[in-house]
């Protein structure tokens, strides 16, 4: 008799995706982040669902409802901080997942990579709208500043901004629609993640060497299920430690002050995971130019596969490219630091230099270095 998991219409989909899936025998812990992102998404949807039961998306009561969740709801404080810090964990896993893709040449699977870029945009949009919901000072002013960027679009800009606001400023209509979008987007993200996985399983996983691994495959279960469970346990350990010991470590104190349209905070800045893009935005004195640079700083990932000039897929055997990759990582960390600093000397010039280096490395320096490495190997 054939095994039920291989014949049942629903179970055979799960079987071919998570049980009998042929996987390369040499994939390292850098391949754990896909499953960790899935776990993060589940945590966010569940905690978000319970928060939505008590939250009210009205400018008069939003801040109070969040306070009520933390003070009066059973374990409300835990759910709220799991959700807030879960977002940080989500982005840590996202950045490491994308970094792995860049290092090992996973971007050569075009469909998988492009859906991944789309997922990154969707998660960033969701996180931005979620940050507005508590209706603190930084929520309100962050929403005002970021939505106002659309006014840089020629001709339709100002109309577009007012359309998104639902009025002449960030107000009740804005908060209500942001809550609606923040609720629906994670389910769209889950669907996109399914498509991401579908395309990945069409080709099979890449591996650290970047070579074809068809000759050496092992079943996903039990080898990688056990490995993924270890990763999940470490993720939960890190998240619970953060939530229980220092839940406000990554937040902004200004968000504990209710939103006040008449009082601007001294330094408006987004959550830490947007600081690198915010630094690129601020480093260009022109409004439209800044907005374009902001969008391109993420959209540039979609161009990376077309800039691959090396004869080898992975950076595993390319020391010069490895060096440049880690310079890029250091550059992004520098941009993250600059994004959180006030707009004054010397931070302005450091931000501008780091922004130029970011685009130069990806668009010019790394492709040229790959060609140089080809010549070194007489390829």
UniProtKB/Swiss-Prot annotation:
Heme b b566 binds at residues 97, 196. Changing residue 39 to I: In strain: Isolate IZEA7514. It is found in: Mitochondrion inner membrane. Disulfide bonds: none annotated. The chain crosses the membrane at residues 33-53, 77-98, 113-133, 178-198, 226-246, 288-308, 320-340, 347-367. The cytochrome bc1 complex contains 11 subunits: 3 respiratory subunits (MT-CYB, CYC1 and UQCRFS1), 2 core proteins (UQCRC1 and UQCRC2) and 6 low-molecular weight proteins (UQCRH/QCR6, UQCRB/QCR7, UQCRQ/QCR8, UQCR10/QCR9, UQCR11/QCR10 and a cleavage product of UQCRFS1). This cytochrome bc1 complex then forms a dimer. This is Cytochrome b. It comes from Sorex antinorii.
């Amino acid at each position: 008799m054939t095994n039920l998991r291989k014949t049942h219409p629903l179970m055979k989909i799960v079987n071919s995706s998570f049980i009998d899936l042929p996987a390369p025998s040499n994939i390292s812990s850098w391949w754990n982040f896909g499953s960790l992102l899935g776990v993060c998404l589940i945590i966010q949807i569940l905690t978000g669902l319970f928060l939505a039961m008590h939250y009210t998306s009205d400018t008069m009561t939003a801040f109070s409802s969040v306070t009520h969740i933390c003070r009066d709801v059973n374990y409300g404080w835990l759910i709220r901080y799991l959700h807030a810090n879960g977002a940080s964990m989500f982005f840590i896993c996202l950045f490491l997942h994308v970094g792995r893709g860049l290092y090992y040449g996973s971007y050569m699977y075009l469909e998988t990579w492009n859906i991944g870029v789309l997922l990154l945009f969707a998660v960033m949009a969701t996180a931005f709208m979620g940050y507005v919901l508590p209706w603190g000072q930084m929520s309100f002013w962050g929403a005002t500043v970021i939505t106002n960027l659309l006014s840089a679009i020629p001709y339709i800009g100002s109309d577009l901004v007012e359309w998104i606001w639902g009025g002449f400023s960030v107000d009740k209509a804005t908060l209500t629609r942001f809550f609606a979008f923040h609720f629906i987007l994670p389910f769209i993200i889950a669907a996109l993640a399914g498509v991401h996985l579908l395309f990945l399983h069409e080709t099979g996983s890449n591996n650290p060497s970047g070579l074809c691994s068809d000759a050496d495959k092992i079943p996903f279960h039990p080898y990688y299920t056990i490995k993924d469970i270890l990763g999940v346990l470490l993720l939960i350990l890190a998240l619970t430690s953060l939530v229980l010991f220092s839940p406000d470590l990554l937040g902004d104190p200004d968000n504990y002050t209710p939103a006040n349209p008449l009082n601007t905070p001294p330094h408006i800045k987004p959550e830490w995971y947007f600081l690198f893009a915010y630094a690129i935005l601020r480093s260009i004195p022109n409004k439209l130019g800044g907005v374009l640079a902001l969008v391109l700083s993420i959209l540039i990932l979609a161009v990376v596969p077309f800039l691959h000039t090396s004869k080898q897929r992975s950076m595993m055997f390319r020391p010069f490219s490895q060096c440049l990759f880690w310079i890029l990582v250091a550059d992004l960390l520098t941009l993250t630091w600059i994004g959180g600093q006030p707009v004054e000397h010397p931070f302005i010039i450091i931000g501008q230099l780091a922004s130029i280096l970011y685009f130069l490395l990806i668009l010019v320096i790394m492709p040229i270095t790959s060609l140089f490495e080809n010549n070194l190997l007489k390829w």
